[in-house]
Amino acid sequence: MENKKTCLHGKHVEAGALMQPFGGFDMPIQYTSIIDEHNAVRQHCGVFDVSHMGEITVTGNDAEKYVSHIFTNDIKDATVGKVYYGMMLYEDGGVVDDLLVYKMGENNFFLVINAANIDKDAKWINDNAKGYDVEITNRSDYYGQLAVQGPEAEDVMRGVLGQECSDLTFYTAKTVMIDGVETIISRTGYTGEDGFEIYSSHEYIRKAWDELMKSGRCKPCGLGCRDTLRFEAGLPLYGNELSDKITPVMAGLSMFCKLDKPEFIGKEAIAKQKAEGIKLKVAGIELHDKAVPRHGYTVTCNGKEIGKVTTGYQSISTQKSVCMALIDAECAKLGNQVEVQIRKKSYPGTIVKKAFYQKHYKK
């Protein structure tokens, strides 16, 4: 089956980007180099085409009640414009997807989901809506999305796109009319830096991209550095640090599962795991030597296999060899000594916190 293309696909090809399949789309992995693009976001500003992400709207009299039923975080007292991170769970606590939920109005919610999960999520959201007075619309084909990220992102939004965003704090959003098109701008991102995400029509997303490129103030970035950036910040990737087998408790994300809510799908399983403990846990590991721990590499403790690497890199920002790994929970205590098996050689490492880089968000 042919991969889908975003509304900016032609511009990426024209610019000579390295294109590869990701989440069912033909996406730019890098333009110049992953290191250059990573550093641009950490030091200045980078822009990503993230139009492959999915968008679903939930409206109707029971919209808030229904979103609360399928979402782990608590949206009960949400003001219009608030954005929440959380998960949708199966009854056993496995993760359907992790997502953002935007409250766009009274009983009007905007859900942003992972590209590879669009069809699965849309079906799951519809299947669980029986008995609720809601209208669920998959808008994934309508919206394009840009992520403008980095310490200079606010200046770029103002100076290049004419959008004043100083009123937005971290995890808030607003709707603006641009060229007669309703556009959502939020102060969110997946890089560990300050930044904004823009959801609009394909036509406006193409126009905004051209303006950003023309300005010279914003480097085009591919999904290669999006992964190195999110990894350094300790942010999970669905399929690696979260999955239908890796629960929020195992991933260290149970703070986004509000057990004081009356109910949500999977609540009982999460409460049970928190009370009884877990056998596996996602941990951070820093190697003592320069070697690159890759996804799937074996982690051992005193020669005994205890798990596998979920994501690993030589950190571009710190130059340290670090990884996240799903390992035996009893071995995951900070300071514990483990080994990662890389090309038939054992490299010693220490269990550390999963955030390998200090995040810079505007609170």
For each predicted feature, which ranges?
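Conserved, structured C-terminal
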Residues: 1-23, 27-29, 104-363
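Acidic, proline/glycine-enriched N-terminal capping motif
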Residues: 1-86, 94-96
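Short amphipathic beta-strand starts and helix->beta connectors
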Residues: 34-43, 88-98, 130-132, 177-184, ...
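A subset of signal/propeptide-processing and intrinsically disordered low-complexity segments
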Residues: 44, 92-93, 222, 227
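Well-ordered mid-protein domain cores that form the structural environment of catalytic cofactors
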Residues: 74-107, 112-128
